[in-house]
Amino acid sequence: IPDTYPEGTEEDKNGNLVTPEGIVISSDGTVTLPDGTKLTPDADGKKPTVNKDETVTDTKGNTYSTDGSITDSDGNYTRPAKAVIKNVSVSKNSVKMVLNEECKGALKYDYVIGTSEDMLKTGQYTKVLKNQEELKSAFAYMDKGTWYVACHAWFKGEDGKKVFGQWSEIHKVDVSATTPQTPVISKVTVKGSTVTVKYTKSKNSQGYDVVLSDTLTKTNGQKRPAVSGENYYVKKIKGNTVTVTFKNVKSGTYYIGLHAWNCTSEDNSKTFSEWSNVRKVKMK
C-alpha cells in the first residue's frame, strides 16, 4: 500500500484498497467515494489521486471531500458539503431539527418535512423552509402522525443560480399531539366602544385565545395581533363559545385574530392551532 494513501488504508478480499473513510481504490485506478461517486482514469491513463487527508483529486484537478463538498483546481467550491442532522426533536406539534455543524461552502440551507420516506425522490413535501441562515429550524403546527425531515445546503454560482449540496439522511419523527383546526373570523361588529367578534368552531379544540391589539407581530411566519403595544385586549375562552365581546375599547386602529388550543400533548400543556385570518377595525 503506497505511503501516499491515508493511514489505515487496507486491502479487501477483492483486491481493492479501502481507506478508513470508505474510499475504494480499484486496481484499474477507479476511485469510488463513500456516496457512490466513481472517478475514473482519463483517456491518457492519468488516474485520480487519493490524498492523505481522505480527499480525492480527479484528473481535471477537482477535489472531492468525504463530507460531500467539491472544489475546483483554484480551491473554489463547486458544491457545498452534505448536511448532517445532529438532532430531531418534537415539542407538542412542533418538529425541531439541528444540524451537526456548518456545511463547508454553504451560504444558506433549505429544510423540508413530509409524510413519505421517499419525499426526496418525489419532491413531495408538506412544508419547506427555504433560505435559512441558522443551523436549526422548526416546523410548527404539524398534524399528529409520522413525519420525515431532511436538509441540504446551497450557495449561488456565478450565474446567480443555486448550487445545492447533497441531501442529508432522512430522519423520522412522530408527533403525538393533535393540532386544532384553524379558526376563521366570520364577522366583526363595532358599536360605540364595543367590538363583537364571531368565528368558526374549530375541530379538536378545547378553547380559544382571541386578541384585539393596535400592533401586529409575526409568529412562525404568520401575522397576528400582538400581546404588546399601547393597547391590547385578550379574551381566553374555554369551551366552544364562538362569539366574544370587547367592551370599553379605546379609540384607534386595531387588529383582531385568534387561535384555538387543546391539551393533547404528552405533558397536557396547551397545543395551539395556526392563527386565524386577521381583521382590521377603527374605533372612533
Model-derived features with residue positions:
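Repetitive, compositionally biased segments used for assembly/scaffolding
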Residues: 1-79
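Conserved aromatic anchor
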Residues: 95-104, 195-204
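Recognizes extended acidic, P/S/T-rich segments that occur
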Residues: 110-142, 209-249
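Extracellular fibronectin type III
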Residues: 158-177, 264-284
